[in-house]
A protein has these predicted regions:
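Repeated scaffold domains used in trafficking and secretory/extracellular systems
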Residues: 147-149, 188-191, 228-236, 269-271, ...
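Alpha-helical transmembrane segments of integral membrane proteins
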Residues: 382-605
Length: 605
């Protein structure tokens, strides 16, 4: 019976011991104020009373969670580049038309990061983020009169008034302002199209005129096409015409996927649209045919729309179809929700698309837009979303810093523990070796090694190399700290008792000494984490760390070396700099708070 009672009491005793360590000794209600705190409770109490340290924890946890969790909801293609979205300022007003237009709209056209529209009175409106200030210089109403058509391009706008006179403003380089002589005095213009660095104008007679960057698109008219054109579409390097007899004619001599037109549709085409990847044609019966490159999903036509399409429009990588039941369907790339069409109850009279935006104009003149609304933190010089890169860069920077700290802490604990416990020649030898490692300058060493290896190693191998070098060269500091703590702890009575019981040296270090100095190690590792993050960022900043296209907070700051970036594109360096600064300061505040919390003297201050 006694043996059974002992077995029952043993787990109960262990549970009580654990409870007392965390919760403290239970005290009577009358003695609550004088209740004793366990060491763990004292550390937690001291830390929670340090408002700066608590604020540091909150800031770091928020940044950490954002960098770890948000990329799952905001994925990023690290190879994505789009010069049409380069250096876009922060904001979400790209698809918000002015109140004076919404409810009285006649036509809307989508540019790269801005839009232009006209109301039923012929007034011109602009909104969005403008690539250059010249776009805001709209010719006066007295000069233009009543405008009947508008078209937005990469960074310029075309307009034509009721007298057939053309107007252009925005970028005036590469001959964009040189309107052909035949059109300057006014003409019977059927369609205008502002494109990527060039402009097009189609007359009612079926003649097409082009001007602008002639090196980008070399237009060549097949026999019998000029003078017989009913509609024209264009992307960044090709112009395609729809003739009055229902034929699709690419205006080029070069053969490509765009020129592989299905023969069965020739002579029966009623409308066309073109993305940067493919061409879509709608026949007189409402059937849709698509051909071109296989990327971005533009060839995947929804089966349910066949036979019901009444109009087509196209953005940079998506198509939009208006159906006979007044609904809209979009397919293709949906990176910026440009394929998520809204439900519109009113009768839709026209649809328009361009780049990453789409609009539907209703019978009452209301404008419904969907697609790219803007960027929270703007874009960089290659059109990449700064916010998404900031999240991915934070994940990379924190990962490099954390693994480097784990490596340095592991080596430092082993070397410092053995050195402090053994003493004598072993201590002397290990500490001299630590001094040799400390004398190696990290940044010059990493730069030289990176220059020597160059492109011989992959980007993944380079990242691993940086983590290993950071960890291997930064352990001496924690090794000295562990050595000093072990030297003090090895003289304690519990260590002598463990030796007397025959506990092995490794067991004494691991089970008896290390638990007593673990708080010191945690504090030092926390401070080293911030240092490693700054070191990695410094290396990436000067081009010897993690390189493009992989983002880190360091290489995102590289552009700040340019005076134009500092002055005009502030968002490219302000947001990464603030995030890195807040993160490292927060970690240092946490480290200082932990150091003060484990210091018994902090209770007296």
């Amino acid at each position: 019976m006694k043996d059974n009672n002992k077995k029952r009491k043993k787990p109960l005793t262990m549970m009580l011991a654990t409870r007392r360590m965390v919760a403290g000794q239970p005290a009577p209600a009358s003695e609550e104020e004088e209740a004793m705190l366990t060491p763990f409770q004292m550390v937690v109490n001291n830390f929670l009373h340090d408002k700066v340290a608590v604020a540091g924890v909150i800031c770091f946890v928020l940044i950490f969670l954002c960098c770890i969790v948000l990329p799952f909801f905001l994925p990023m293609d690290k190879y994505f580049q789009d010069v049409t979205q380069a250096n876009v300022a922060p904001g979400f007003g790209m698809l918000t038309p002015p109140s004076g237009l919404n409810g009285n709209a006649q036509e809307v056209s989508v540019g790269s990061t801005f839009s232009v529209g006209i109301d039923r009175d012929g007034n011109v409106y602009e909104w969005g983020t403008f690539p250059n200030e010249k776009l805001k210089n709209i010719p006066s109403a007295s000069e233009m009169g009543k405008v009947t058509q508008v078209s937005a391009g990469l960074d310029h706008i075309l307009a034509v008034n009721e007298e057939g006179k053309l107007f252009t403003w925005g970028n005036d380089r590469m001959g964009l302002e040189a309107i052909p002589i035949e059109l300057r005095s006014g003409a019977d213009i059927k369609q205008i199209l502002a494109c990527y660095q060039f402009s097009l104008a189609l007359t009612e007679e079926g003649r097409l005129y082009n001007w602008g960057n002639s090196y980008l698109v070399n237009i060549s008219f097949p026999e019998g096409v000029q003078g017989n054109i009913d509609k024209v579409v264009a992307n960044t390097n090709l112009v395609v015409a729809l003739t009055k007899d229902g034929r699709v004619e690419p205006l080029t001599k070069k053969s490509s996927a765009f020129t592989q037109i299905p023969e069965e549709i020739q002579g029966h085409v009623a409308d066309i649209a073109m993305t940067d990847e493919s061409i879509a044609a709608m026949t007189e019966s409402g059937q849709v045919f698509v051909w071109g490159n296989t990327g971005k999903g533009t060839l995947d036509i929804p089966e349910e729309i066949q036979g019901h399409v009444t109009a087509l429009s196209a953005g940079r990588y998506n198509f939009v179809a208006l159906l006979d039941d007044n609904s809209m369907v979009s397919w293709g790339d949906n990176t910026f929700q440009q394929a998520d069409v809204p439900g519109v109850k009113e009768e839709i009279v026209s649809i328009s698309s361009g780049y990453y935006g789409n609009y539907a104009v209703t019978e009452s003149g209301k404008v419904h837009g969907w697609g790219l609304k803007g960027y929270l933190m703007g874009t960089d010089d290659l059109g990449r979303d700064v916010f998404r890169r900031l999240l991915q860069g934070g994940r990379m920077t924190m990962t490099v810093g954390a693994i480097a700290v784990i490596i340095s802490a592991t080596i430092g604990i082993l070397v410092g523990g053995v050195s402090g416990y053994k003493g004598g020649k072993v201590d002397n030898l290990l500490m001299r070796f630590a001094e040799i490692v400390s004398s190696i300058p990290f940044l010059p060493f990493a730069i030289i090694l990176s220059s020597i290896l160059g492109n011989r190693i992959s980007e993944t191998q380079r990242i691993i190399m940086i983590m290993i070098i950071l960890g291997v060269l930064s352990w001496p500091g924690i090794a000295r700290l562990v050595r000093g703590s072990v030297l003090a702890e090895r003289e304690q009575e519990f260590v002598t008792a463990a030796k007397a019981l025959g506990v092995k040296e490794f067991g004494i270090i691991l089970r008896h000494i290390m638990p007593n100095i673990i708080t010191v190690i945690i504090v030092n590792a926390t401070l080293d984490f911030a240092t490693c993050m700054l070191t990695e960022s410094s290396l990436s900043f000067i081009g010897f760390g993690v390189t493009e296209p992989n983002p880190t907070w360091g290489n995102m700051l590289t552009g700040s070396q340019n005076a134009k970036v500092i002055e005009d594109y502030w968002w490219r360096w302000v947001f990464p700099a603030i995030t890195l600064g807040i993160c490292t300061i927060s970690i240092n505040c946490v480290g200082d708070g932990l150091r003060d919390a484990v210091d018994p003297k902090s209770n007296e201050r």
